[in-house]
């Protein structure tokens, strides 16, 4: 076990109520000493004599849910002043941790002969070991067990029976006990009757195992009594070939078997949770032609219960919080449990510059995962963003994938899911309310103590009475400059009429009006924080660092200054946990975080990726998606997400379509769902347009190769595409430097349609690579922007407009100049002009403004007319 995990130790808990019984205390001390001697981490959990049944049961549940504990024994009797149902308490112990073997499940398995799939009670197990040590074969022998207790007699009978002895159980109602004993080749007693079995009863040469513990008066002893067994030892030893003394016979073996069961439990735990060892079943698709709508397909498939899927992929029951039958949240503690395990292969799916309809990155992500898992027998996880309600109800639609490559249930995925976006909306708007409330009260109320930290203001004093008037003002008032406020209210709906609003119109606000706006929720910095955080504490720190405005003296104002970061953390405490769902074919999917890819970094959460990489094991794959084209989502994935996660991808999958390449090759702009008139070129073969449009594909392959990662091009095939068009794209992609290029039909065929893509990805993951970032984080802000513009977009240069130059100076002065860059620009072109397709050249990229997402950890320059509220 140490070889698999040097930090691993079997864990044992002994639960005792009261602790006033000397005999129980003695037994426990012996067990704890033995555990310590062999390296078991043993804990004595002592509950007070006043403990109620529910308190005892809750303690047991806590131990059941502790993955570092592999054995739990409940010391009997339960010495409580309250009425306790011992049977109920005993059966509350998880069967896989019941190293005493006393639960009904373990007893039942023993009775049925499932000796290899249960824990055998320690005393009978020790007795069997003693019998084996004599050299006598149990098979065919006559055995007599006196007593039928659940601890000794009943399990001893079962154990002897399934070792092929002919067994008789004797008890208080047995007639002519002496005659029955006289037939026994093997005699085991456990009745609690001092020296009841006489030597003359015993068959000559028999094996006698005495499990009785009885106290009888003895004036020669200091305490006036001595311990004897159920057998009269002096006379019995003359008849028996082997006999155990009392004390010192069975007792040490009982302790030894307890240690053995604990180690066995730990071994079973390691085997069951071996890295990458999944016991997963996949769902066979019933493909229909023509392919039905996404919602029809989704509803036609019955998903596995999500708790079953969680168990199949190695999650423990207490690590999973169920939200109904088809979705669940996964506890962050999973990362700690799996910390020593090696990560799997990391794949990011991106695309060429898309049409407004999208080119199928999500569909390809799910199709690839289904191919790798259900068809190529690899452990694989999809990690995708949670979609915003705005685009879901817009032209782009949902983000669950499509056809026979989607996440199900589709409605759950695309709408509320587990409420993460609603939590972000509440948290974001709490900050907005706090900003306006603070400005209102500072302008209408007398001086009060505030929350700004002394050290931040350069006030090196701790005694308030020594503050000067200036220092008091600086400490008590944030003095927010209304013109500097960058924090906006949000909602998860595309509502163009909220792009500019006026707040404070009520008479109660005493004329404190200002213009503001509503952004879409996924544009909130809190969403970016959620996606980039690595722990609850890290999220708390990031939320506290979010800059919402600047004071009139130029000091950045944070949520910490507003006194709301604690409340934000509480609002986000559940949202930080990744959401578990599944594909149509039964593969696991993490759906977590959904920052926009144009104004934020456009990637799902770091936490989801990290948990998934541990769960799949070193030979498995995690496939995640970067929003929009490679120039947007992929660049930010590498330069922002990978910087903060420390993860390095093995493969880039670049999705292309014939439709988009024809548009980039000079075809009409795709703007709607209907293809008529001059858009018929998208329906019929046109190799010339495809070849010209591959300039965009070539540029995006080049962009991916800037980071030193192999690129596999996935051509998402539509039924209107010709074979010649698909092969031409694959040929040109390889010539552009792609590791491989493969046509895919996963939309129509599910995972089977992406098998060749899966094989290509597996090969690429084994290819040598040398990952590197595009720019040094310590470069000046302008230089970092210029590098992205020139190397990724193909711009000649950048132009900083006055507002942008002011922000560069301000953020550099405030200490934010070393943050990575998150360009906010249109996703419909490599340039800032959405109408320019293909590979635009000869342009200067205008930077009209720059904003800071200090909590998330990046600066985002605003390019062109990019909006933060949907159309």
Named regions from a protein language model:
Residues 66, 181-182, 203, 341-342, ...:
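A short, aliphatic-rich alpha-helical micro-motif
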Residues 12, 138, 142-143, 347, ...:
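Conserved hydrophobic helix-helix packing surfaces used for dimerization/oligomerization
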Residues 70-142:
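Anion-binding alpha/beta catalytic cores of soluble intermediary-metabolism enzymes, centered on
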Residues 83-111, 211-269, 389:
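Rossmann-fold NAD(P)-binding glycine/threonine-rich loop
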Residues 77, 190-193, 212-213, 627, ...:
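Short glycine-/small-residue-rich Rossmann-like dinucleotide-binding loops
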Residues 276-871:
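Flexible phosphate-sensing "switch/lid" loops adjacent to ATP/NTP-binding sites
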Residues 17-37, 49, 113-211, 216-234:
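Glycine-rich phosphate/diphosphate-binding loop of Rossmann-like nucleotide-binding domains
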Residues 1-78:
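N-terminal ligand-binding/catalytic initiation module
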């Amino acid at each position: 076990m140490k070889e698999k995990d040097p930090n691993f130790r079997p864990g044992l808990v002994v639960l005792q109520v009261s602790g006033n019984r000397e005999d129980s205390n003695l037994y426990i001390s012996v067990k704890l000493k033995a555990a310590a001697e062999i390296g078991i981490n043993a804990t004595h959990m002592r509950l007070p004599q006043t403990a109620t049944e529910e308190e005892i049961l809750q303690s047991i549940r806590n131990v059941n849910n502790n993955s570092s504990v592999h054995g739990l024994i409940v010391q009997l009797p339960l010495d409580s002043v309250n009425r306790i149902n011992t049977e109920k308490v005993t059966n509350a112990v998880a069967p896989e941790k019941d190293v005493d073997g006393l639960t009904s499940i373990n007893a039942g398995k023993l009775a049925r002969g499932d000796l290899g799939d249960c824990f055998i009670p320690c005393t009978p197990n020790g007795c069997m070991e003693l019998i084996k040590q004599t050299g006598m074969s149990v098979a065919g022998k006559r055995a007599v067990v006196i007593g039928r207790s659940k601890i000794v007699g009943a399990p001893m009978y079962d154990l002897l029976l399934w070792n092929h002895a002919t067994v008789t159980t004797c008890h208080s109602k047995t007639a002519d006990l002496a005659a029955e004993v006289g037939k026994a080749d093997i005699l085991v007693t456990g009745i609690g009757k001092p020296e009841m079995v006489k030597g003359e009863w015993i068959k000559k040469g028999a094996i006698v195992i005495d499990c009785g513990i009885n106290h009888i008066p003895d004036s020669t002893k200091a305490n006036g009594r001595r311990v004897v067994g159920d057998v009269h030892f002096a006379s019995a030893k003359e008849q028996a070939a082997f006999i155990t003394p009392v004390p010192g016979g069975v007792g040490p073996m009982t302790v030894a078997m307890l240690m053995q069961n604990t180690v066995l439990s730990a071994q079973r735990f390691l085997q069951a949770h071996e890295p990458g060892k999944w016991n997963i079943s996949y769902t066979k698709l019933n493909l229909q032609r023509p392919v039905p709508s996404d919602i029809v397909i989704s509803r036609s498939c019955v998903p596995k219960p999500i708790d079953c899927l969680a168990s199949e992929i190695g999650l423990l029951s207490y690590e999973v919080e169920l939200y109904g039958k088809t979705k669940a949240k996964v506890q962050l503690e999973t990362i700690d449990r799996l910390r020593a395990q090696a990560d799997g292969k990391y794949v990011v799916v991106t695309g060429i510059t898309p049409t407004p309809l999208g080119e199928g990155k999500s569909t390809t992500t799910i199709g690839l995962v289904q191919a790798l898992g259900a068809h190529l027998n690899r452990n694989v996880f999809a990690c995708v963003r949670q979609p915003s309600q705005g685009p879901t109800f817009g032209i782009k639609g949902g983000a669950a994938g499509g056809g026979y490559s989607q996440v199900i249930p589709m409605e759950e995925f695309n709408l509320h899911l587990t409420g993460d976006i609603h939590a972000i909306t509440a948290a974001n708007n709490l900050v907005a309310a706090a900003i306006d409330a603070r400005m209102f009260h500072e302008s209408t109320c007398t001086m009060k103590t505030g929350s700004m930290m002394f050290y931040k203001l350069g006030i090196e004093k701790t005694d308030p009475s020594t503050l000067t008037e200036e220092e008091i003002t600086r400490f008590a008032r944030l003095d927010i400059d209304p013109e500097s406020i960058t924090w906006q209210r949000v909602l998860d709906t595309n509502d163009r009429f909220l792009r500019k609003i006026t707040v404070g119109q009520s008479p109660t606000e005493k004329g404190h009006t200002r213009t503001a706006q509503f952004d879409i929720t996924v544009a909130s910095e809190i969403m970016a924080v959620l996606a980039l955080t690595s722990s609850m504490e890290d999220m708390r720190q990031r939320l506290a660092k979010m800059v919402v405005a600047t004071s009139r003296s130029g000091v950045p104002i944070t949520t910490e200054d507003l006194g709301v970061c604690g409340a934000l953390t509480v609002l986000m405490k559940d949202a930080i946990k990744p959401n578990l769902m599944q594909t149509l074919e039964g593969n696991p999917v993490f759906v977590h975080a959904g920052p926009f890819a144009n104004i934020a970094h456009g990637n799902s959460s770091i936490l989801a990726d990290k948990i998934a990489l541990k769960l799949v094991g070193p030979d498995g794959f995690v496939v995640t998606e970067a929003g929009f084209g490679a120039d947007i989502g992929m660049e930010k994935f590498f330069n922002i997400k990978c910087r903060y996660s420390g993860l390095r991808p093995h493969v880039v999958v670049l999705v292309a379509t014939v439709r988009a390449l024809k548009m980039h090759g000079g075809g009409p702009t795709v703007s709607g769902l209907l293809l008529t008139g001059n858009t018929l070129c998208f329906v019929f073969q046109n190799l010339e347009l495809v070849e010209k449009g591959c300039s965009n594909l070539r540029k995006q392959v080049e962009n991916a190769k800037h980071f030193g990662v192999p690129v596999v091009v996935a051509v998402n095939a539509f039924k209107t595409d010709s074979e010649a068009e698909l092969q031409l794209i694959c040929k040109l992609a390889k010539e552009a430097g792609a590791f491989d290029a493969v046509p895919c039909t996963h939309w129509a065929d599910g995972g089977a349609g992406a098998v060749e893509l899966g094989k290509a990805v597996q090969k690429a993951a084994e290819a040598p690579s040398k990952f590197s970032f595009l720019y040094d984080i310590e470069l000046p802000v302008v230089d970092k922007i210029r590098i992205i513009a020139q190397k990724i977009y193909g711009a000649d240069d950048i132009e900083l407009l006055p507002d942008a130059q002011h922000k560069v100076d301000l953020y550099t002065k405030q200490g934010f100049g070393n943050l990575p860059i998150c360009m906010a620009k249109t996703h419909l072109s490599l340039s800032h002009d959405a109408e320019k397709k293909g590979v635009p050249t000869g342009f200067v990229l205008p930077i009209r403004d720059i904003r800071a997402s200090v909590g998330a950890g990046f600066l985002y320059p605003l390019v062109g007319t990019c909006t933060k509220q949907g159309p």
